[in-house]
Swiss-Prot record:
The keyword Ribonucleoprotein applies. Part of the 50S ribosomal subunit. Forms a cluster with proteins L14 and L19. Belongs to the universal ribosomal protein uL3 family. The keyword Isomerase does not apply. GO terms for biological process: translation. PANTHER family: 50S RIBOSOMAL PROTEIN L3, LARGE RIBOSOMAL SUBUNIT PROTEIN UL3C. This is Large ribosomal subunit protein uL3. One of the primary rRNA binding proteins, it binds directly near the 3'-end of the 23S rRNA, where it nucleates assembly of the 50S subunit. It holds the Pfam family Ribosomal_L3. One of its GO terms (molecular function) is rRNA binding. InterPro entries: Ribosomal_uL3, Ribosomal_uL3_bac/org-type, Ribosomal_uL3_CS, Transl_B-barrel_sf.
C-alpha cells in the first residue's frame, strides 16, 4: 500500500536504540514492532452512522476469545487478534480498503511527523513529591514530621472544604498519553519495524498507536 491516509497504525513498543546519521550524529529512536494490521470491519455512514476502518493485530489463543468476538472475527474471516481498534476514514476513501486486507508500515515514510499514543508506565500509589514534583521540607532544622508532607490542603472554616482538583497523593501513571510531532527516522516493512525519533509513552511490550501528526 503506497497511498497515505490519516488513519493510524497499531504497533508494539519494542524498546529504544540509536541510529547514526551519515554525518556521524547519534539519533535516539524508539523501535515499534509494526506487524501488519488486519482489517476486521469496514464501517459506513449508511449502516453505522460514521465511516471507519476497524483493525486487529497480533494473535490470541482461541480459549481467550469470547463468543461475540469469535463470531465477529469468523464473519470477517480474519484471525483473532489481541484487540480491536478503529480509525476514522473519509467516506470517499473506504473503497481503498477491504475486510481481510492488511495495512502495513509503508503507510508512513521517512521524515514524516507522527503522533504516538500509548499507556504510560503505572507507578501505583505515590506521594505528591514524586507525583507532582512538590518541594520537600527541610531534612533538619527542627523538622521531624513533615519531610515529605504536602503542606496545607486549603484555608479555614471558610470555605470549609478542599477544592476539587487539589494535588494530593494518589494513583500515578497507567493513563493514556500522546506524544506529538515525532519524526519517522526509518521504516523497515520486511522486518516489520518503525524507528521514531525520541521516546514514546509506555513500557516495552505495550501497544501504541502511530498516526500522522495532527499539528504538523
Amino acid at each position: 500500500m503506497t497511498k497515505k491516509y490519516s488513519l493510524g497504525f497499531v504497533g508494539r513498543k519494542a524498546g529504544m536504540s540509536r541510529i547514526f546519521t551519515e554525518d556521524g550524529r547519534s539519533v535516539p529512536v524508539t523501535l515499534i514492532e509494526a506487524t501488519p494490521n488486519r482489517i476486521a470491519q469496514i464501517k459506513t455512514v449508511e449502516v453505522d452512522g460514521y465511516s471507519a476502518v476497524q483493525i486487529t493485530v497480533g494473535a490470541r489463543r482461541a480459549a481467550l476469545v469470547n463468543k461475540p468476538a469469535a463470531g465477529h472475527f469468523a464473519k470477517a474471516k480474519v484471525e483473532a487478534g489481541r484487540g480491536l481498534w478503529e480509525f476514522r476514514v473519509e467516506d470517499a476513501h473506504l473503497g481503498d480498503f477491504a475486510v481481510g486486507g492488511e495495512i502495513k508500515a509503508d503507510i508512513f515514510e521517512v521524515g514524516q511527523k507522527v503522533d504516538v499514543q500509548g499507556v504510560t508506565k503505572g507507578k501505583g500509589f505515590q506521594g505528591t513529591i514524586k507525583r507532582y514534583n512538590f518541594r520537600m521540607g527541610d531534612a533538619t532544622h527542627g523538622n521531624s514530621l513533615s519531610h515529605r508532607a504536602p503542606g496545607s490542603l486549603g484555608q479555614r472554616q471558610t470555605p470549609g472544604r478542599v477544592f476539587p482538583g487539589k494535588k494530593m497523593s494518589g494513583h500515578m501513571g497507567a493513563v493514556q498519553q500522546s506524544t506529538q510531532n515525532l519524526e519517522v527516522v526509518k521504516v523497515d516493512v520486511e522486518r516489520g519495524l518503525i524507528a521514531i525519533h525520541g521516546a514514546v509513552p509506555g513500557a516495552a511490550g505495550g501497544d501504541v498507536i502511530v498516526r500522522p501528526a495532527s499539528k504538523a
